[in-house]
């Protein structure tokens, strides 16, 4: 892993050495998500990364639609100082203790998505 990624995520090369190769988990992942609309923070980045791994594994790329909570938060909270997942979680009082861990980030993203919907509900009704 690049030093920047290690610093940002606190994920080490040792941690990765115990992980199965992407090619062995991607089929189950693709089956799980099916044609669902995905919700992710900075969704284009995640989809690009996943599609590169799919290509590398000789699998078809995904074409799922996605809702990007980064863009959604920029629209819902234009005056927010930052729009990172961690910053938004802190500003909203959402516990995001284990940042940069897939399961925890997914739960945080879900909470931010629902909060954005709730906070913009009155705007949508106008």
Task: Please annotate each region the language model reported.
Residues 5, 9, 69, 108:
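Ser/Thr-centric signal marking residues that sit
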Residues 91, 110-126:
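Acidic two-metal-ion nuclease catalytic site recognized across multiple nuclease folds
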Residues 63-73:
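A short, structured active-site edge motif that brings together acidic residues
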């Amino acid at each position: 892993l690049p030093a920047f990624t290690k610093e940002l995520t606190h994920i080490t090369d040792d941690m990765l050495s115990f992980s199965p190769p992407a090619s062995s988990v991607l089929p189950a992942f693709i089956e799980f998500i099916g044609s669902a609309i995905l919700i992710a923070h900075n969704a284009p980045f995640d989809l690009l990364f996943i599609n590169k791994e799919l290509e590398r594994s000789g699998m078809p790329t995904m074409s799922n639609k996605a809702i990007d909570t980064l863009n959604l938060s920029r629209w819902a909270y234009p005056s927010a100082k930052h729009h990172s997942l961690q910053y938004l979680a802190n500003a909203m009082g959402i516990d995001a203790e284990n940042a940069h861990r897939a399961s925890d980030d997914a739960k945080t993203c879900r909470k931010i998505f629902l909060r954005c919907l709730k906070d913009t509900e009155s705007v949508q009704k106008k």
